[in-house]
């Protein structure tokens, strides 16, 4: 490469397949690993939300969708339900998306993400050490229960 030249990356490989830089790859399914207890956030088909340590549990595969800058919805792929925080702080899941299904996603200094309710703005998505969800009214900055590491859920 000569000094001052510009190189562009192709969007397709020569054989027509996708490259690692293909558009839409950010939409790959994720697992949200909680620092508190080592559980993955699970959205069950019956609407319950809890944690599971079983990496093969299909209910931990989640679709995070940006709805605006810094705001995401979290959908359980197998359950086909959206994570929601109710007015009493309970975590549940809903078949149809509502204003209770949007969360501020923030990358913290320790490289974990937090998910804070947009509607109930001082409450966070959190899991207890037992794998049960933690009520939003009992959450706050600095707690291990609110820290999640997004991991690939492909395959």
Curated annotation (Swiss-Prot):
Proregion span(s): 1-9
Record's subcellular location: Secreted; Nucleus
Which keywords belong to this entry?
Angiogenesis, Developmental protein, Differentiation, Growth factor, Heparin-binding, Mitogen, Nucleus, Secreted
Q: Which Gene3D superfamilies match?
A: 2.80.10.50
Major subcellular site: secreted
Compositionally biased spans, kind Polar residues? 1-11
* Segments of this protein annotated with the region Disordered: 1-24
* Annotated site residues (Important for interaction with integrin) in this chain: 128-129, 134
Q: Which SUPFAM superfamilies match?
A: Cytokine (SSF50353)
Please report which protein family the annotation says this sequence is part of. Belongs to the heparin-binding growth factors family.
Q: What does this protein do?
A: Acts as a ligand for FGFR1, FGFR2, FGFR3 and FGFR4. Also acts as an integrin ligand which is required for FGF2 signaling. Plays an important role in the regulation of cell survival, cell division, cell differentiation and cell migration. Functions as a potent mitogen in vitro. Can induce angiogenesis.
Q: What protein name does the entry list?
A: Fibroblast growth factor 2
- In its UniProt entry, the species of origin is given as Xenopus laevis (African clawed frog)
């Amino acid at each position: 490469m000569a000094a001052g030249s510009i190189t562009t990356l192709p969007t397709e490989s020569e054989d027509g397949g996708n490259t690692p830089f293909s558009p839409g790859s950010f939409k790959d399914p994720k697992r949200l690993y909680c620092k508190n207890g080592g559980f993955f956030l699970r959205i069950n088909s019956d609407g319950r939300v809890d944690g599971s340590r079983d990496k093969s549990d299909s209910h931990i595969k989640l679709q995070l969708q940006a709805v605006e800058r810094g705001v995401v919805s979290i959908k359980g792929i197998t359950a086909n339900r959206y994570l929601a925080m109710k007015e009493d702080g309970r975590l549940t899941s809903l078949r149809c998306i509502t204003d209770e299904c949007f969360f501020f996603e923030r990358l913290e200094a320790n490289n974990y993400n937090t998910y804070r309710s947009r509607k109930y703005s001082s409450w966070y998505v959190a899991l207890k050490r037992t794998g049960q969800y933690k009520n939003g009214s009992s959450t706050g900055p600095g707690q291990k229960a609110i820290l999640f590491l997004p991991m690939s859920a492909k395959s």
